[in-house]
């Protein structure tokens, strides 16, 4: 039996002798009305438990959109343009918006990688920067005395919008979320 399975970024062909195949499990069909950018826009237009983003941000405010770096499979190039449109509808100027790629302990991005992550429109329209552990503001300490340092651009913003994913992590259990 020949099968095509997803592996990495491209499908892989595998051949399994018929006598070794016990069966094939298939997922139930899911009803999907919208996908991709259409679903992102619908979600921004109909938020759960809050008002629309365009009703939260105000003209003159500094807005930072924080997203994952190149090591995470977040489709920021699909998500952030719709977020920008929502922010622009609120009257926020492009000059007051920055996209921060949260590096953690990872290396900085090349300009080409930033374009791949964010798309040309976002990269050319607003400030797109990597977080910098050497440019932080001390916000305080935890109860156990651990310093809480936040990247200056994020700390000084009036509004912070976080975009990310939650996925299995090979030694931490899960990655993303409130990390």
Residue positions per predicted region:
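Short glycine-rich or small-residue beta-strand-to-loop segments that form or flank ligand, phosphate
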Residues: 62-73, 98-104, 162
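Histidine-anchored nucleotide/phosphate-binding helix
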Residues: 73-92
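Short helix/loop capping segments that flank catalytic or ligand/cofactor-binding pockets
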Residues: 14, 23-25, 74-75, 163, ...
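N-terminal amphipathic/basic leader segments beginning at the initiator methionine
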Residues: 1-43
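Short alpha-helical segments and helix-capping/turn motifs at coil-helix boundaries
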Residues: 48-51, 82-86, 143-153
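An acidic, phosphate/nucleotide-engaging active-site surface
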Residues: 109-175
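Short, glycine/charge-rich beta-strand/loop segments that flank catalytic centers
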Residues: 96-106, 131-135
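Glycine-rich phosphate/diphosphate-binding loops that line cofactor/substrate pockets in enzymes
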Residues: 48-64, 89-95
């Amino acid at each position: 039996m020949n099968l095509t399975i997803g592996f990495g970024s491209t499908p892989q062909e595998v051949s399994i002798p018929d006598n070794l195949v016990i069966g094939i499990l298939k997922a139930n069909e899911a009803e999907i009305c919208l996908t991709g950018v259409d679903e992102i826009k619908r979600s921004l237009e109909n938020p759960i438990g809050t008002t629309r983003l365009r009703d939260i941000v105000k003209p003159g405010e500094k807005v930072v959109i924080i997203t994952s770096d190149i090591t995470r499979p977040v489709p920021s190039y699909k998500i952030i343009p719709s977020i920008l449109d929502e922010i622009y509808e609120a009257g926020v100027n492009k000059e007051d918006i920055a996209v921060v790629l949260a590096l953690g302990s990872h290396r900085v991005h090349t300009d080409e990688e930033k374009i791949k992550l964010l798309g040309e429109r976002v990269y050319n329209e607003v400030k797109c920067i990597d977080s910098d552990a050497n440019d932080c503001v001390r916000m305080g300490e935890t109860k156990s005395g651990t310093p809480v340092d936040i990247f200056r651009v994020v700390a000084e913003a009036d509004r912070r919008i976080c975009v990310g994913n939650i996925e299995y992590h090979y030694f931490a259990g899960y990655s993303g979320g409130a990390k």
